[in-house]
Amino acid sequence: MTSTVTLFRNIVETATPFHRPVDVVLQRIKEGATKDLVKRIRAERNKTARNELKKGLPAICFSGTFNKRNDKSLVQHSGIICLDFDGYEKKKELISHKENLTKDPYVYSAFVSPSGNGLKVLVRVPADPDNHVNYFNALQKHFDSPHFDKT
């Protein structure tokens, strides 16, 4: 089953959504559709400047189709939760954790975040928006990682 997700031009543009199959979005990430900007983000040492650069990336809402970029504008849940794992001290640790996560039966996809210092992990869940937070909390317990971003 192909899930449809929502993209916005960037984090500031929240009114004009684009809807695409998740596999198309993942393929574009894999192919490096924004690789030049990602390289600039990863090279930038100043956190404020890096955050400004990140505002130029497309904003992806993996959890479903939305009319706008807020929870109340959910049209249909995709059956996907995007988890963030952050705070890795060393690149080797990040890569090792990514490899381990991809072996987990719940993980649909895992990739290095645009900053290069974290991971984005997609997990399939029932497409039930009423239980989205419950699934998130259960996944936090399942992965039991100090790098799991609880926000």
Regions found by a protein language model. Name each.
Residues 1-79:
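DNA replication initiation on ssDNA origins
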Residues 2-15, 67-90, 125-151:
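DNA replication initiation modules
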Residues 45-48, 101-105, 139-147:
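Hydrophobic, Leu/Ile/Phe/Ala-enriched alpha-helical segments that form helix-helix packing faces
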Residues 80, 104, 118:
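Beta-strand-rich binding-surface signature
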Residues 84, 111, 122:
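Residues in well-ordered beta-strands of folded domains
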Residues 88-106:
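Short amphipathic alpha-helix segments
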Residues 109-115, 150-151:
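Short beta-strand
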Residues 117-124:
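A generic structural motif
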